[in-house]
Amino acid sequence: MKPYADASFIVALYLQQESSKAATAFMQRHGEPLPFTPWHRLEVRNAIRLSVFHGLIDASQSKSQLKQLDVDLQDETLLVHTPIDWVAVLREAENLGAGKSETLGCRSGDLFHVAAAVELGCDQFLTFDERQKKMAKAAGLLVKI
């Protein structure tokens, strides 16, 4: 299996959440780093920063987790920088949206992650977002979380 994780899954590896135990358990079983695109970089890092705004963590915890994210990317233990054809991803996202957004209610960001998974040739999709799970299944991806 070649998994692709959205930001909800990756953030659960860095911030203590209800879903953290499931995310950590998957990574221990899987044992391979997950693709990490520039879109992930923006979304994951911003989610960690927003946790300070929402009072879930303090600024020092945010700084520590952002540093750990960078270490993990450098070590390629959990995540690996992954180049991607953004034009192809946007086209795939539009195709997915045209076929399913009216019935599944997916947002553009949801479509973007599913399209990226398809473009990277992944066959498994990791998310804690219910709408995204439905879209990933509709795109033919196995949803395990």
What do the predicted segments below correspond to?
Residues 2, 25-35, 39-105, 111-118, ...:
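PIN-domain endoribonuclease scaffold, especially VapC-family toxins
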Residues 16, 106-107:
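A conditional alpha-helix N-cap/helix-loop micro-motif detector
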Residues 1-21, 46:
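Metal-dependent nucleic-acid phosphoesterase active-site entry motif
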Residues 106, 125-126:
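Conserved SAM-binding loop
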Residues 142-145:
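Short hydrophobic/aromatic-enriched beta-strand-loop microsegments
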Residues 11, 132-133:
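Glycine-rich nucleotide phosphate-binding loop and flanking beta-alpha elements
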